[in-house]
Amino acid sequence: MPKFALKALWLENDLAIAVDQVVAKNRSPLTHYFFWPRDDAWEQLKAELESKTWISEVDRIELLNRATELINYWQNGGRNRPISEAQAQFPDILIGGNS
């Protein structure tokens, strides 16, 4: 059964979120990046995951809930904190960027 993992780009003015499929510890991109607040990343991610009917509802909800937590953290001041702090807060999400 496939597993899924979020990844994020921590940018100065945006947070970009994407999903990878994880098979045998190897990650393969499943979606492109969705940007917040430039676009409604959460709604776009939801629509993308729903279009992939082979992803279970449980997995979709889990990914969207975790994306919500990440967006809220970034929005509530996390964007001004070092990436290392975000990575410590969200160890299950691969985070990269320029801060």
Swiss-Prot record:
GO terms for biological process: translation. It comes from the Bacteria. Keywords: Ribonucleoprotein, Ribosomal protein. One of its GO terms (cellular component) is ribosome. The keyword DNA repair does not apply. Pfam families: PSRP-3_Ycf65. InterPro entries: PSRP-3/Ycf65_sf (IPR038447), Ribosomal_PSRP3/Ycf65 (IPR006924). Gene3D superfamilies: 3.30.390.140. One of its GO terms (molecular function) is structural constituent of ribosome. The keyword Cytoplasm does not apply. Disulfide bonds: none annotated. Belongs to the chloroplast-specific ribosomal protein cS23 family. Part of the 30S ribosomal subunit. Probably a ribosomal protein or a ribosome-associated protein. This is Probable small ribosomal subunit protein cS23.
